[in-house]
Regions:
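Extracytoplasmic/lumenal domain signature
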Residues: 4-78, 99-138, 143-214, 218-257, ...
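Predominantly extracellular/luminal regions of secreted and cell-surface proteins
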Residues: 83-106
Length: 542
């Protein structure tokens, strides 16, 4: 429902007063635990997580033909080995478990944030109304790669940059452009790619080949500017393939590609906001010394639940999938978390996660058993008029989809600016081992929020740090050689905070001047992130 700016401001003021008085007698957080028994190490549904309980009806299309079943020609099985052959951050949150928040170690005894460089971006007209897409949006994480000398020789990187020890930042932003920058000083390493569609989500680089996947979050103002996904050759910046636009197999009319895909066995897996999950074989090869692809085995999974509609509990996925063995896990705008066998594209189990789920899950292996941690925004479930309600954060058994525990936070939301959890959590290591850390927006008041750390085993809140401005940006963490953690958390007020992981104490803050919805990428002591204020920042910890 569209509302005027004046009405939204009035409601925010009213909610501010209501939430102030509610704090006098209402619990703003609560914990629910469930009887959970670890069974056999087999992925399967239970009575509570059967797809039929969510009213799921699914269809498959393979190479343009609807089919009842499918078996992948080259089966996928993901080991515990590193996801990427590159040094750097090649997908949202770094890898297939979405726990690769940074690359390399930071230096010890450094605790101050410093702006090293900035790069201006521009704006792009929206496909509806009179507004513009500006800066870097949600999730908006840059990619960072340190190329080898041989790789640089094959690329159209500027000759002066080929002579240096180059670490390249590749950043797709909401002005429809892809920027290629030197992480040291922000200087351009090659020409900008101008696609002309807004990139709200995060791109992805193939983990062993110089291929770049781009997914716009919306269409443009012209008829031909419809949203679809792209694959580019990073050696020469040529577009190799596009897919997903105006797909007749889709149930939902809207289309976008905020999700950051994963690549395995020459296959790509990409969920879309049109409600489809795409998978196809790249058949990547060199032809006349030039990298190209010849996609085939093109598979689309379509489904809907008993509550799916164009008006509420939408189909479509904005989060990025995680993978364990041959299973893909993804949540959707309609509050459904799915486990899918990647080799049959069959939905194995489905769990109700209540509300619009935008933050990506993180996968944790605990004593050999896989678990998922994921939170939701407050979109469909708040009270009708004041838009208040509990927003859940879940620990879920990845084998059968059953709840282990749920931690709720009481939040506010307004049209277009959701409260709750929009981010993806940190799964701690070293000195923050056994902690799951994430921000909650619009609690305990309208414009503020908190960063919280929970015990992964019990859901108990270990620490909570108040934030004067709420955060959609996902936190990143890095460790020094001794295993001491520092967290970087950006917020809607344009602040970047440096936070001690063990107790949540803010030890430094830095203003970047405008709302930071995007998630930073971190390599060593260097951090890169864009703001809605049409700037990309290079920041270092000193």
């Amino acid at each position: 429902m569209k509302t005027s700016r004046a009405f939204r401001i009035f409601m925010m003021g009213l909610d501010l007063i209501v939430m102030f008085f509610l704090r006098l007698f209402k619990k703003f957080t609560r914990l629910r635990t469930f009887d959970h028994h670890i069974g056999t190490r087999v992925v399967n549904n239970t009575e509570e997580t059967s797809p039929e309980k969510m009213g799921i009806v699914s269809k498959l299309e393979v190479d343009g033909q609807e089919t009842d079943s499918y078996e992948r020609k080259d089966p996928v099985y993901v080991s515990d080995a590193s996801y990427s052959e590159y040094e750097g951050i090649v997908t949202f949150r770094g890898n297939h478990r979405r726990n690769g928040y940074s690359y390399g170690r930071m230096s010890s005894k450094k605790n101050h944030l410093n702006i090293d460089w900035t790069v201006d971006t521009v704006r792009l007209q929206k496909g509806y109304g009179k507004g513009f897409w500006t800066g870097s949006g949600w999730t908006g994480q840059p990619l960072i790669v340190r190329w080898t000398e041989d790789q640089k020789k094959r690329m159209n990187i500027y000759s002066t940059k080929k002579e240096e020890d180059l670490t390249e930042v590749i950043y797709s932003t909401m002005d429809g452009k892809v920027y290629f920058l030197d992480i040291e000083d922000g200087s351009f390493t090659r020409d900008v790619i101008d696609v002309g569609l807004p990139f709200k989500g995060s791109g992805a680089i193939h983990p062993s080949l110089p291929l770049l996947h781009l997914g716009p979050g919306d269409s443009g103002p012209k008829k031909e500017d419809y949203a679809r996904a792209y694959i580019y050759n990073l050696e020469n910046q040529k577009k190799l393939f596009e897919y997903g636009g105006k797909d007749p197999f889709s149930i939902r009319s809207f289309c976008g590609f905020d999700s950051s895909p994963l690549f395995f066995n020459d296959y790509i897996f990409e969920p879309s906001e049109n409600g489809l999950i795409y998978s196809f074989k790249l058949n990547a090869h060199y032809e006349d010394d030039e990298l190209t692809i010849a996609p085939d085995e093109f598979v689309k999974l379509q489904y809907h639940t008993y509550r799916s509609s164009e008006k509420k509990y939408w189909l479509g996925m904005e989060d990025s999938p995680v993978v364990w063995e041959n299973y893909l896990y993804i949540a959707d705008n309609g509050g459904t978390l799915l486990c899918i066998d990647m080799n049959t594209m069959k939905i194995i189990w489905a769990q109700d996660v209540v509300d619009d789920t935008n933050g990506s899950p993180v996968l944790s292996i605990e004593e050999g058993h896989p678990y998922l941690y994921i939170g939701t925004s407050l979109h469909w479930s708040p009270s009708r008029y004041l838009r208040l309600g509990y927003c859940p954060f879940f620990k879920i058994d990845a084998l059968n989809g059953e709840y282990v525990w749920i931690r709720d936070y009481y939040c506010n939301t307004i049209a277009g600016i959701s409260g709750g959890v929009q981010s993806s959590p940190i799964l701690g290591e070293n000195d923050i081992k056994d902690l799951i850390i994430f921000p909650v927006a619009r609690t305990p008041s309208v414009m503020d929020g908190k960063l919280v750390a929970l015990d992964i085993h019990t859901g108990k809140e270990i620490w909570s740090t108040h934030m004067k401005n709420y955060a959609w940006s996902s936190p990143v963490v890095s460790y020094d050689e001794a295993g001491n953690s520092l967290i970087v958390q950006c917020d809607s007020g344009g602040m970047m905070h440096l936070i001690r992981g063990v107790d949540g104490k803010i030890i430094d803050s830095l203003s970047l001047g405008a709302n930071i919805e995007a998630t930073p990428a971190m390599m060593g002591d260097r951090i890169v992130v864009g703001t809605r204020g049409q700037k990309i920042y290079g920041v270092s910890i000193r």
